[in-house]
Amino acid sequence: MNKSTHDGQKVYSKLVLKLYNFVVLFFNNTFLWKCKTSQLLQLYKDNVSHNHLDIGVGSGYYLKNVKDRLSKVALMDLNPNCLEYVKNVLKDKEVSTYQVDILKDVAEEFYAKYESISCNYLIHCLPDNGNKEKVFENIAKMLSKDGVAFGSTIINDYSSKLAIKVANKFNAKGIFDNKNDTYESIEKYLKNNFAEYTIKQIGSVCVYIMSKPLR
């Protein structure tokens, strides 16, 4: 039976979102995945544009820290709690929200619409039904011809027993579904959908930047 995209999103209640910055961005990134939040924030500082789309919005921490560079921002997520929470974080900006399953084809209204797109810490939460590449196909469709997209995801490569234990627990609970996610699989998705890309691994995290969408 195929797993639903909802499975990895339902954990993000309003209470969890209030704890997200400390638990996920400080503790987990620093001590489990060995990729500091400051390194991921740099992706936004280097690449965000005035016309930006964020897919899988989390707590809005990164966007809040670059909001002076945003004229308008679109938020795309399956979880309405996340969309409402981040819209409030960015309440002084022009924000559009879209409740979308990114593993399905996006509507034509989004095609070539955004000059920058971020997809941070989403891939490892999505159900592994053999179609995770659909995320990158959709990003390629939505990115403008001269735009840049970027993101990160936790892969199945851990440096400590504690990280392995936590990752296994998250996979068992459906919070993660990344046992088949590798550096090579992420690079394949990038290569298939973008003419130019860079990818590197920091701890257990793949960090990538891509441009010149193939569509």
Predicted regions mapped to residue ranges:
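A short, conserved alpha-helix within the catalytic core of class I
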Residues: 126-138
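Class I SAM-dependent methyltransferase SAM/SAH-binding core
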Residues: 53-106
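Conserved Class I S-adenosyl-L-methionine
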Residues: 161-184
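Conserved beta-strand signature within the Rossmann-like core of class I S-adenosyl-L-methionine
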Residues: 146-154
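A conserved beta-strand element that flanks and buttresses the S-adenosyl-L-methionine
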Residues: 118-121
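Conserved class I S-adenosyl-L-methionine
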Residues: 1-47, 167
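Core SAM-dependent methyltransferase catalytic element
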Residues: 193-215
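Class I S-adenosylmethionine-dependent transferase superfamily signal
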Residues: 66, 138-140
